[in-house]
C-alpha cells in the first residue's frame, strides 16, 4: 500500500562528482592503457587490488593528457607504488 504512493516521486537525485570532471577520451589517447587495465581485471577475476600498476599507469596517462585534473599519486592511493620517488614540485 505504501509503495503505490511512491510512483510519482523521484528516488534518485544525480549529483556532480566530488572532484572536477572526468572527460571522455574521444581521441583514444589512453586507449592502450585502458585496455591493458581492463585485460588485467578480466585475467585476475576483477580483483582490482591485483591490477594497481595498470590502474596507476592509466591515471597517469589521463593526467598527462589533461583528461583529468592532476593529482599527486599518493592522494589517489598509490603511495606504496611510488618506489621512493616523490613527484617533482615547483618551488618559487
Swiss-Prot record:
The modification N-acetylserine is found at residue 2. It is found in: Cytoplasm, Cytosol; Mitochondrion intermembrane space; Mitochondrion. Residues 1-12 have a biased composition (Polar residues). Residues 1-20 are annotated as: Disordered. A motif (Cx9C motif 1) lies at residues 30-40. GO terms for biological process: intracellular copper ion homeostasis. Interacts with CHCHD4/MIA40 forming transient intermolecular disulfide bridges. This is Cytochrome c oxidase assembly protein COX19.
